[in-house]
Amino acid sequence: MITVQSLSKKYGGFTAVDDVTFTARPGRVTGFLGPNGAGKSTTMRIMVGLTPATSGSAEVSGRRFADLPNPGLEVGVLLDASAQHAGRTGREILTVAQRMMGLPARRVDEMLDLVSLSPDEAGRRVRNYSLGMRQRLGIATALLGDPGVLILDEPANGLDPAGIRWMRDLLRDYADGGATVLLSSHLLHEIEVIADDLVVIGQGRIVAQGTKAELLEAAGTLVRTPRVHDLAGALTVSGLAFTPSTAAGSTDALRVEADPALVGQVAQQAGIALIELRAAEGAGLEEMFLELTADTQREGAAA
């Protein structure tokens, strides 16, 4: 289990992480989402002891990362696949980690097989690896000690579609075996497919968290009309709360906190023709993400 409590990080007058609290539970994949610069990577670095917190705490299985006697046996970490030693071979990197953890030598070959790095690829220096190969090596290193917790920042970067599916299945199986998986990714569809729980961060603060089903169900109704301003007025008169929807860059859509039947009734009574009317949960994670983080987005940034 990962427990983050009232976590904050300040750099001078800039607050990168602001009173963040959430829990990632065993047997579940937790998707950690937010726009670029939202504080995801800083939070993860604090979790694994690479960045000191200004206040608050981040614990793995009830202890700080720095207090774990042999961290690799309890927490598998992949924050930056490009940070591996470029002058070593893939096998050498895994062998160093295997010896530091006190594991049998056979674990190196087991992990190379698991991530589909061939003997030839394992013998190459990392400087000659593609980003996808570095990601596979990083995942192998994270899984080497068979830890009960995984903390992965953008592990799908550089993987082709087949590689992304492989990673998704691997992490799903790992969580189903009882492990805690915390996963950050800008590939919202992949998070939607694999995640059980979601934590959404914007400008260093948590803007939403809960199970994926809960958050998507709370999306309400998506409605589109050329007369969006007239519909907004009718909804206001009816006492229904709504917000502009940013789905697919739309400017004629609203998300209404009511069921589709009621929204359709209001539109009909006002004589307003609708282009689209459906439960917003059908819009999926991208719709929810864009709406929750609308005030924290940089132009063109997805996560």
Model-derived features with residue positions:
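Structural motif corresponding to alpha-helix initiation and N-cap regions
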Residues: 41, 105, 123, 134, ...
